[in-house]
UniProtKB/Swiss-Prot annotation:
CDD domains given in the database record: ACS
Lineage of the organism: Bacteria, Pseudomonadati, Pseudomonadota, Alphaproteobacteria, Hyphomicrobiales
Keywords assigned: Acetylation, ATP-binding, Ligase, Magnesium, Metal-binding, Nucleotide-binding
Residues reported to bind Mg(2+): 535, 537, 540
The keyword Transcription appears for this protein: no
Chain's gene name: acsA
Residues annotated to bind CoA: 190-193, 309, 333, 521, 582
Binding site for ATP: 385-387, 409-414, 498, 513, 524
Protein name: Acetyl-coenzyme A synthetase
Organism name: Xanthobacter autotrophicus (strain ATCC BAA-1158 / Py2)
Amino acid sequence: MSDKIYYVPSEWAQKAYVDDAHYQSMYAASVNDPHAFWGEHGKRIDWFTPYTKVKNTSFDPGHVSIKWFEDGITNVAYNCVDRHLETRGDQVAIIWEGDSPDESRNITYRELSSEVNKLANVLRNRGVEKGDRVTIYLPMIPEAAFAMLACARLGAIHSIVFGGFSPDSLAGRVADCGSKCIITADEGLRGGRKVPLKANVDAAIAQINGGVDHVIVVRRTGGKVDMLPGRDVYYDEATAMVTDECPAEHVNAEDPLFILYTSGSTGKPKGVLHTTGGYLVYASMTHQYIFDYHPGDIYWCTADVGWVTGHSYIVYGPLANGATTLMFEGIPNYPSVSRFWDVIDKHKVNIFYTAPTAIRSLMQAGEEPVKRTSRSSLRLLGSVGEPINPEAWEWYYRVVGEERCPIVDTWWQTETGGILITPLPGATKLKPGSATRPFFGVMPEVVDAEGKVLEGACEGNLVIADSWPGQMRTVYGDHERFEQTYFSTYPGKYFTGDGCRRDADGFYWITGRVDDVINVSGHRMGTAEVESALVAHPKVSEAAVVGFPHDIKGQGIYAYVTLMDGEEPTEELRKELVGWVRREIGPIASPDLIQFAPGLPKTRSGKIMRRILRKIAEDQFESLGDTSTLADPGVVEDLIHNRQNKRDAAA
């Protein structure tokens, strides 16, 4: 835990929407009278029929029900496109930066309107109507945003499947939600490599024996693909046959907007269901206040639209606010490790939102690739996806932002729809590694294992005591699983699945998933804490920590460590790291086993697959489960070969 504090400079407080006093009064109003607070802020989007009911929610066991603005009628595409046409039709809505630096495209709000309406007409002509599900399996190209908004325009429900998922994973998701139409591309491009998207779609449909009537194929690479007459059509040919006028369907606030599948701790992926009104109000409001978005800013979130961050903070939040949002097809280190910083300079990006794993991997390459670029346009930095260790936070602040850009370290989940705990740049002093304070209307509590609410400075499990507008409504087709997963552990409260520490200032520090907690000799140890200690060592680039069975302690600590470029793994360094962690946290946190690894198993979105690391640490690598989402499967073979916990020396 870092004890450094960065106070809010007066220029941040003066320029931002909210300073500390304003935050305190708005937050108090939001939790003391949520009906009045959200009744007012719900008006930030346009309604065809204004709501008269604001909040109708229950977390009671057996009666979990979440409704916001339930009698209001609106349309998400209308709010993200049409309502901007009169005042900013010629403003750029989407800057697209391709995988290759010589490909980019600017799309104005007027052009966006035309593209969305044409695709909506293509879908409607193929029988897609309100309530139908459409699966989107596309790379990070503008058509992904067009497809989302075209579905929303019709009141259809989109289910985006990340382009890195295998045909098996795609098939499961298509079958679960009953999609009748899939929008895909011939191939994707990522880091100069082609991804066979259309071939994957064909393989997925073959697995589920029909049900998919239409496949719309964007020509991204021009690669040759099989096209089934009557089912498959090229996007450009279909949109050339229709007009660019399509009325926006009148949609109830509680009608579904999208399903997004997220991994469950057990069983098949959960279809997280988000609805229309509350979700858009929350995505829009959090985007404005947390990123301090002002008209004219160029905003870039580096996520993929296949993840919730891409839904809320590339497409829906920014476009609802009339922003200019940047979509990036590529990866941080292609064609060079300066790519992020080159894109920032090329497009004069003001607000930059990325993941700690990207920051750590770029740290590994040193400061020179950053410092050879200007980055003078940057005003604010953000972090999302996992707790950011203080060392990476400090590097991001010092090297990337040159100590002039606040960092918003945002905590939220697929299930929450938008950011729940975060600094506000003009209001919140910053502590490296802390997500700081709750956003308006969010009521976090820290509870012990029995569910007792802890007061003051404490450590325990993070729950949310009451609903907020962006909250998921159910697991698609399985409300019982929704209640069981999120509301049964601590009845009457939403259980986040994360551990949390609250300090004397009331700031929240996310300590990692509760299933990423190791119990060492009866002491609970958050893996994120041990990882932070390891990564604070100057020779360590990245670390992942898991538990493994230990005869005496119950669980031991197994650390996978990736070193900085040029550093050699030695027995001396191994001992040095054990001593380092002992000093940083205490003897209880000493790693029992340290495995030096050239890389860690990550999904294509950059998340470390800890499940695989746990299996290898337990010497159970024969049953690694689904590894189809791995960015580099070769990493796993190296980890297995060099594992430190072999059952016998000859293994």
